[in-house]
Amino acid sequence: MGIQEENKVGKVVIYTRVSNPGQKDDLENQVEFLKTFANARGMIVDEVIKDIGSGLNYKRKQWNNLIDSCMERNISTIIIAHKDRFVRFGYEWFEKFLRKMGVEIMIVNNEKLSPQEELVQDLISIIHVFSGRIYGLRKYKKKMSEDEDL
């Protein structure tokens, strides 16, 4: 009698993300790690979502589809490796919002950081994103100067 899975309303979803296509191996490692985690707890994973893009980008298609499914109450559990694999900033807000939708987020590597350590990680993330944008602008400027039609 007592198998709780029979009463499960929504799906169990593994969500993985890397910042760029060059990290696809890391994406696969996340998937395998999270599947092992779920299996060890007797959880049946209904869907695996693999996303490529910045955690600061809230226009990620896979991520938005996941949020939409949560709002439609089709998801009961999201399993992630780290908070920053879900969103880079504002995790607590999303966690509270999704909890109201009946969704539990399970963080496998939930290391506790001091406020100072979190601030340093946030600053490093911001610097990384903006340095990438500067590089992209330089590349664009160079391309513009080389294009004779412009």
Residue ranges and their predicted role:
Residues M1-L150:
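Short, structured surface patches at the beginning of a domain
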